């Protein structure tokens, strides 16, 4: 494991005079200080709030912290911006002062990470840790930030013996999430000695939750739901086109504006439309240009984003690279972006200050159908409007449907002329369109968030976590079900599911029991549970077993290992859809050329999907594995080829994005490549790797790090309790000479792939694609057309087999590495006659190549 060095934001905290100031007010155990009483905790905390934070607490914040100090649970159902985070700080401080371990949980890793840094800043890095499945930082700290599932699994594994003194559960409305709600309910049922702070702006009626929590813990639950909204909201429904709505809001000074869309494509479409309307002043554009001066926009979407940012418009959605999302958030926090076009991810705790929220629709696609927004979804988004400390009110605008806007435009054009009014043909909603109107908007404004519907499930991993705790696991699982907030019918189904799981575990000899003297049973496991089971890579044990099926002597061994790893990773759906679309387009062209009729083409087209290497072998192996290892039934394999496809086609990140036209989803691709790198580096034993696989792993690391280093750093820096002085000792001394090439093996593969990709395109006779790759170093489309004509005048074809790709035909000269930060490379083309008289030669710019993730040349030529 790597030491967690204080880099970036964490390192800069040491220069902050307030760094760790709240943590310093807690008792110093090393000097023999004792716990302090609640009055002293209250006094120290609120003195710190006023002196260091410089704010005067609101009554509801004081009330909540007093309730927590009294030992009660608190449900904090207060509006966005009402200071829930301050209450959580008070809970963590009280726990630190009384020797209890406290947890902060959130639904997504980005929020957990953000809170981790916030808490480190006020409590000091020695007091705060983070666990997110693939990241463990200072995991023994007294304050832990983690995802909800981490805490739920710990609660099942340790029960009331868990070292969890108190928990702040943020975004608690996820309790009603059909897929993940179980993780918010389980701790409430299994940690009877733990104090809970449940927080959200959109909880609705929580009486049933409060009653259940009080019953399970025999502790009072205080509901605080009457806090006034710090910045009141005003609402408008408009029949103006979106561009005019934004223009009017800009003219009235109602910025910053967040334009909410329910698809990533729609967000970009609006941003492009607004870019020419002048939503920013000359001074704002100059400030933005200065702020982004050092930012490298190296990817296809990055160049689009750069152009939009310079006009004052930001983009924000989950398909972007993390570094681009962070940049937009930082610019917004500095007040530099008048307009941000994004998706409804705005509602999930993203720290972006907004004055006005413009909803482009009051409907969304929920994965199965279009439907109207629910009250909770609406308030989650609308509640982001209004900046505390800046605005006296926030503004929420809803756009009418497009057909209603067109009708209003026609009516306005007709004016009061009866003849013109009579001629107007009112447009209707398209067939099947789920529409809305001003009444829909008014109802959403007035509606309270729906009462949360609880969700529970029983899985093999949940049962095994209970078994690992020891004692009567079956009794505890039955009690978990009986104590849950589910309906009698749901409980009956959960008990039946538990019966199936326990029987399977017995039948496969995974668990056994021993009778106790009191008539009860002790459950225990006969096999070892994988480390971090069900938290990170639950199918890693299967992967290790399946690797035995491969022949290390096979020419495709390294690629087959990659396919096995890819089958255990979460699908990058946008990438796979693009692969399938391209495969079907190519198949359609071939079928038309073969003269197949329309119906037959359509039938065959449905059978074509994205590549799934080793699918039959993997599925057969997995079926057998699930019989022997029944907890694997909680998961499934998903064969696919993304990393393998990139290797086989010698693609770099930028080229792969262009090939499948997925610039808007480059963040999705990068996250997948990062997951693949971590799985390969962590899971595949060294004895199962050959030289080619090691090369590919190194290449993946270079690609991911060069595009967005945070995704590699997040994992590689995970691990540890090194203090600041130890971490600093690991950093290079001032003035120490840094290596020109950080990862020689990975960079070599990147360059070789880039050179051989050009050979592949020569074989396909693709001057357009070659010109797009090489126009910046003097070989555009026309130059490549002439080059290919000359080559094919001399040779019949280009070989692209293993011999053509071998190291014998790739020459690397590193002699100018230190003096000029350059490599001289030569890719000899394996022609049909074996003359080897043609070659692609270039001088690689090492610095730019390593920072951009694609090969950049100082000079370049293709000749014989």
Which residues make up each language-model segment?
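Helicase-associated low-complexity/disordered flanking segments
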Residues: 1-74, 279-310
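Non-catalytic terminal extensions of ATP-dependent helicases
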Residues: 2-7, 12, 314, 333-334, ...
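Conserved P-loop/Walker A NTP-binding site and adjacent catalytic elements of P-loop NTPases
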Residues: 48-234, 238, 256-281, 316
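Conserved C-terminal RecA-like helicase domain
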Residues: 103-105, 113, 120-129, 264-339, ...
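Conserved two-lobed SF2 helicase motor
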Residues: 140-156, 311-325, 331-351
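A short beta-strand element within the Helicase C-terminal
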Residues: 164-167, 339-364, 393-399
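Conserved interdomain hinge at the start of the Helicase C-terminal
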Residues: 236-262, 269-272, 326-335
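Conserved segment of the helicase C-terminal RecA-like domain
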Residues: 356-359, 363-366, 371-416
């Amino acid at each position: 494991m790597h030491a967690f060095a204080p880099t970036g934001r964490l390192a800069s905290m040491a220069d902050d005079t307030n760094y760790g100031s709240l943590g310093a007010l807690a008792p110093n155990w090393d000097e023999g200080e004792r716990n302090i009483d609640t009055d002293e905790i209250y006094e120290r905390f609120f003195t710190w709030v006023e002196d260091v934070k410089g704010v005067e607490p609101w009554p509801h914040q004081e009330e909540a912290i007093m309730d927590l100090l009294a030992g009660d649970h608190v449900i904090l159902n207060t509006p966005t911006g009402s200071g829930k985070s301050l209450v959580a700080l008070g809970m963590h401080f009280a726990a630190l002062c009384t020797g209890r371990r406290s947890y902060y949980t959130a639904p997504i890793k980005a929020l957990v990470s953000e809170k981790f840094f916030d808490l480190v800043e006020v409590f000091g890095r020695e007091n705060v840790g983070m666990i997110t499945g693939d990241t463990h930082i200072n995991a023994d700290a007294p304050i832990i930030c983690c995802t909800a599932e981490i805490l739920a699994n710990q609660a099942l594994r340790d029960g009331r013996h868990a070292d969890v003194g108190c928990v702040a559960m943020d975004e608690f409305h996820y309790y009603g999430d059909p897929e993940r709600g179980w993780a918010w309910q389980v701790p409430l049922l299994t940690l009877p000695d733990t104090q809970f702070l449940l927080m959200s702006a959109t909880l609705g009626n929580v009486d049933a939750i409060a009653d259940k929590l009080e019953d399970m813990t025999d502790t009072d639950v205080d509901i605080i739901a009457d806090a006034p909204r710090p910045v009141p909201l005003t609402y408008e429904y408009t029949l103006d086109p979106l561009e005019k709505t934004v223009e009017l809001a800009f003219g009235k000074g109602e910025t910053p504006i967040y334009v909410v869309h329910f698809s990533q494509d729609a967000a970009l479409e609006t941003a492009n439309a607004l870019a020419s309307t002048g939503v920013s002043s000359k001074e704002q554009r100059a400030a933005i240009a200065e702020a982004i001066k050092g930012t490298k926009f190296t990817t296809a979407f990055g160049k689009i984003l750069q152009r939009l940012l310079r006009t004052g418009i930001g983009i924000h959605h989950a398909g972007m690279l993390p570094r681009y999302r962070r940049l937009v958030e930082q610019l917004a926090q500095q007040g530099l972006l008048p307009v941000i076009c994004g998706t409804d991810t705005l509602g999930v705790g993203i720290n972006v200050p907004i004055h006005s929220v413009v909803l482009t629709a009051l409907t969304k696609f929920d994965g199965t159908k279009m439907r109207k927004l629910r009250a909770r979804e609406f308030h989650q988004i609308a509640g982001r409007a209004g900046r505390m400390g800046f605005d006296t009110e926030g503004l929420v605008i809803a756009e009418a449907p497009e057909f209603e806007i067109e009708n209003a435009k026609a009516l306005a054009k007709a004016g009061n002329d009866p003849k013109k009014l009579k001629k107007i043909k009112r447009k209707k909603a398209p067939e099947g369109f789920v529409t809305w109107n001003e009444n829909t908007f008014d109802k959403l404004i007035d509606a309270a968030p729906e009462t949360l519907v609880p969700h529970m499930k029983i899985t093999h991993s949940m049962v095994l976590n209970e078994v690992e705790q020891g004692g009567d696991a079956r009794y505890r699982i039955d009690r978990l079900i009986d104590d849950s907030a589910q309906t009698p019918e749901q409980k009956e189904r959960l008990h039946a599911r538990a019966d199936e799981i326990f029987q399977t575990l017995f039948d496969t000899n995974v668990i056994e029991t021993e009778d106790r003297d009191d008539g009860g049973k002790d459950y225990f496991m006969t096999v070892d549970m994988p480390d971090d089971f069900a938290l990170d890579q639950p199918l890693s044990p299967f992967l290790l077993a399946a690797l035995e099926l491969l022949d290390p002597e096979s020419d495709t061994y390294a690629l087959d290992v990659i396919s096995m790893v890819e089958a255990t990773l979460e699908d990058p759906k946008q990438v796979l859809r693009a692969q399938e679309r391209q495969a079907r387009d190519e198949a359609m062209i071939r079928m038309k050329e073969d003269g197949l009729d329309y119906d037959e083409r359509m039938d065959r087209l449905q059978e074509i999907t994205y590549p799934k290497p080793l699918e039959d072998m993997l599925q057969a192996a997995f079926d057998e594995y699930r019989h022997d290892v029944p907890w694997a039934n909680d998961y499934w394999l998903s064969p696919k080829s993304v990393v393998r496809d990139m290797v086989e086609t010698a693609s770099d990140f930028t080229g792969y994005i262009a090939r499948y036209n997925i610039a808007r989803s480059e963040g999705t691709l990068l996250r997948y490549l990062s997951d693949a790198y971590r799985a390969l580096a962590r899971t595949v034993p060294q004895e199962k790797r050959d030289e080619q696989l090691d090369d590919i792993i190194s290449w993946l690391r270079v690609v991911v790090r060069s595009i967005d280093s945070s995704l590699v750093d997040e994992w590689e820096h995970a691990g540890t309790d090194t203090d600041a002085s130890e971490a600093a000792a690991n950093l290079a001394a001032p003035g120490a000479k840094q290596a020109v090439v950080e990862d020689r093996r990975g960079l070599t593969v990147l360059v070789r792939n880039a050179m051989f990709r050009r050979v592949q395109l020569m074989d396909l006779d693709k001057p357009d694609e070659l010109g797009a790759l090489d126009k910046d170093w003097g070989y555009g489309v026309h130059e490549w057309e002439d080059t290919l004509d000359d080559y094919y005048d001399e040779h019949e074809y280009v070989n692209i087999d293993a011999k053509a790709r071998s190291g014998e035909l790739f020459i690397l000269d590193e002699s100018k590495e230190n003096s000029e930060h350059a490599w001289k490379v030569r890719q000899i083309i394996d022609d049909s006659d074996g003359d080897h008289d043609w070659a692609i030669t270039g001088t690689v710019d090492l610095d730019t190549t390593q920072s951009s993730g694609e090969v950049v040349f100082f000079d370049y030529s293709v000749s014989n």
